Amino acid sequence: MIYVLLFIVLVFFSVQVFSLGIMLVHEPSVISPRKVYPKISILLAARNEEELILRNLSALEKLNYPLDKLEILVGNDASTDNTANLIEDFIKDKPQFKLYYIDKTLGKGRGKANVLGQLAHHASGAYYFITDVDVKLPKSWVLALLQEF
């Protein structure tokens, strides 16, 4: 079961990286409005990312997507710097964000795969999107990815 979950997470990550690459080369100038906004779970693994974490969280906060249909799950992977404190301070009074402290290993998963696998267990969205702390996300990121569904 864990291998299936990790495989799914890795497939989603690969599709997302490919889609984001296409968006960065040519971001759609017109994104059709949706009639239905499905619930989206965004998974973000963070380990010792104090230099970039606030930029990424700020970009996620500014996404053009209804807040009640969005959950952003951040997994702090045993950071030894100030990453966890920065995340905690940023997400106060932002119910769409949830921070999870990852201190155990799920199955044989290690590193980022372990963090994403554990976050996937907490996610409740119809779609899971995975990003990385060092990715610059455009406001239209979620809507652009949903254009394909």
Predicted regions and their residues:
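Glycine-rich, basic loop-to-helix element that forms the pyrophosphate-binding segment
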Residues: D103-A123, A144
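N-terminal membrane-anchoring/stem segments of glycan-assembly enzymes
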Residues: M1-V36
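Acidic donor-binding/catalytic loop of UDP-sugar-dependent glycosyltransferases
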Residues: N82, V133-E148
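Cell-envelope/extracellular polymer assembly enzymes that use nucleotide-activated donors
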Residues: P38-S41, E71
